[in-house]
């Protein structure tokens, strides 16, 4: 009979399992190593490509500089040649004037002059005349070439960053509910100790209850209801029309000493139809002190705002 096959022992199973796990770990390590090598190779390729591009840019810049230097040198050489030509012409003309100009001498010299010399002199005179007429064109060409090189170099220069203040930060810090305010409270802003009120009249008749003005240091008037403390809905009023600001100011006391007191002031914020105190228009962007029983009007509205406080006489 054939011997019966035995199942592997638990120890053998554990060994096989450990061996299989090691093989799996090795294969994973090999895969990870392969990935790392590929990443390194790709990074090296990218670096090589970047170096090649940098070399190409440097080469282009050097070539442009060489072209500019050659053009400038050629322009200088042309100028030097023209200067030499002028000097030679001056010397030749000076020598001709120094010689005798009598008719007998001229006829004697012309008879002795050889035909070759006459032809050569005529050729020189023609070349000088042509060169003199071409001088301005050569100068214009050299100047045009130099300007073209300078413009090309200037175009390649990158625009330098500007570090000047743009005012955007200050604008963002002075925003309320998405709207840029036209007014900033001054350092001397304070809440009033007196209970000031505005009594509203229209055509001599009081409207609603008086407006209390003692709970905060400033009150904004205007048509923009999202930011106005006291809305003024008349079409002639601006969105940010005017502001009443309480300021702590120095004041002389009855005994002659200086003391501080919180007083109300009004400022027109550059409105279209102005702000009025006792029927007189006030200048924009300037503080005007308000006194008890002053009457304020905004734009062409018929409403009148009378300023009083709790201790005002009836």
Swiss-Prot record:
Biased composition (Basic and acidic residues): 18-127
Keyword check for Nucleus: yes
Positions of modified residues (Phosphoserine): 133
Subcellular location: Nucleus
GO CC annotations, alphabetized: nucleus
SUPFAM superfamilies, A to Z: SMAD/FHA domain
Phenotype upon changing residue 238 to A: Loss of interaction with DCL1
Function field: Involved in the microRNA (miRNA) and short interfering RNA (siRNA) biogenesis. May facilitate DCL1 to access or recognize primary miRNAs. Binds RNA non-specifically.
Native source species: Arabidopsis thaliana
Protein name listed in UniProt: FHA domain-containing protein DDL
């Amino acid at each position: 009979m054939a011997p019966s096959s035995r199942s592997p022992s638990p120890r053998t199973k554990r060994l096989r399992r450990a061996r299989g796990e090691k093989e799996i770990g090795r294969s994973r390590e090999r895969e990870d190593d392969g990935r790392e090598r590929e990443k390194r190779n790709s990074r090296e390729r990218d670096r090589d490509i970047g170096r090649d591009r940098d070399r190409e840019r440097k080469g282009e810049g050097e070539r442009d500089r060489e072209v500019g230097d050659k053009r400038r040198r050629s322009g200088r050489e042309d100028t030097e040649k023209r200067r030499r030509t002028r000097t030679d012409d001056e010397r030749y003309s000076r020598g001709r004037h120094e010689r005798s100009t009598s008719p007998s001498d001229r006829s004697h010299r012309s008879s002795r002059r050889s035909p070759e010399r006459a032809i050569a002199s005529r050729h020189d005179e023609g070349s000088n005349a042509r060169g003199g007429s071409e001088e301005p064109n050569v100068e214009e060409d050299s100047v045009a070439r130099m300007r073209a090189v300078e413009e090309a170099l200037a175009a390649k220069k990158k625009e330098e960053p500007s570090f000047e203040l743009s005012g955007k930060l200050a604008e963002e810090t002075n925003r309320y509910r998405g709207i840029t305010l036209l007014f900033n409270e001054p350092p001397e802003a304070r809440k009033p100790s007196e209970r000031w009120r505005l009594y509203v009249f229209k055509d001599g008749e009081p409207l609603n209850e008086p407006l209390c003005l003692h709970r905060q240091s400033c009150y904004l008037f205007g048509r923009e209801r999202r930011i106005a403390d006291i809305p003024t809905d008349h079409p002639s009023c601006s969105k940010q029309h005017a502001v009443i600001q309480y300021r702590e100011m120095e004041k002389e006391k009855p005994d002659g000493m200086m003391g501080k007191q919180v007083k109300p002031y009004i400022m027109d914020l550059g409105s279209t139809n102005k702000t009025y105190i006792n029927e007189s228009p006030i200048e924009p962007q300037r503080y005007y002190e308000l006194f008890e029983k002053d009457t304020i009007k905004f734009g062409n509205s018929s409403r009148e705002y009378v300023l009083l406080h709790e201790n005002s006489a009836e």
